[in-house]
């Protein structure tokens, strides 16, 4: 019987440089898609995928994230007094989503360094990782799709999608075994962090969803700092590949990189179009203003 994945890690200590000056005082993870912070979408995806415990890795300037997932008795009591019962339930439900823990990453030395901060939380259990910049809208949560692949293979699994071959230098790219065009589950031979288009072995990009084993921690302590002078998770995964099988799950869904200006705006428009409180006519009027 395969062990259920109960724990997930969400790295959220980044500086949000691409969204400055908005992120000077506000964590980028707290910037909203319409009226809900982006990190709440990530947490909700984890919960819908069966995750019970979540560790969010933050920096010293990210206390707003802690506050968001905590109870706010003053606000809740005020809503009750004003008979705003629906709003009260919505606020209370946020604090009850899951068992959420926090740890500070003292220096932002890369994704691999952030993952190392989760070692004591994870213990000897296999676990999931969700990156906060990658918001995915799909009927079946992207992480759940990756977990299904993990349960099928009992191997470390990464979520991928095909990207424009001209843009592979923005992502971690996998080297697949054989033809991958008509497959959803693909064996991984290697991974390369932000390769030049001419050097990429595929256009399958690693897009912020992982199911990992505790062996990743030893691997990350065994590899040198890589691209950008940071400890890269991709390098740790390649170290594991020497002794373990890896699979990539080509997940379905509409994915946005909300850590970029264009991705953040597109995600807001997509969310608005699917929000019951906002008519499509209103969104189209906004687009017409832009055209004018």
Swiss-Prot record:
Care to name a GO molecular-function term for this sequence? Answer: UTP:glucose-1-phosphate uridylyltransferase activity
**Its domain of life?**
Bacteria
User: Under which main EC class is this enzyme filed?
Assistant: transferase
Under the heading InterPro entries, the entry gives:
GalU_uridylyltTrfase_bac/arc, NTP_transferase_dom, Nucleotide-diphossugar_trans
UniProt keyword annotations, A-Z: Nucleotidyltransferase, Transferase
Q: Name one GO biological process term.
A: biosynthetic process
Q: EC?
A: 2.7.7.9
Substrates-to-products reaction catalysed: alpha-D-glucose 1-phosphate + UTP + H(+) = UDP-alpha-D-glucose + diphosphate
Its biological purpose: May play a role in stationary phase survival.
Q: Which family does it belong to?
A: Belongs to the UDPGP type 2 family.
| Protein name in UniProt | UTP--glucose-1-phosphate uridylyltransferase
Top-down, what is the taxonomic lineage of the species of origin?
Bacteria, Bacillati, Mycoplasmatota, Mycoplasmoidales, Mycoplasmoidaceae
Q: Which gene encodes it?
A: galU
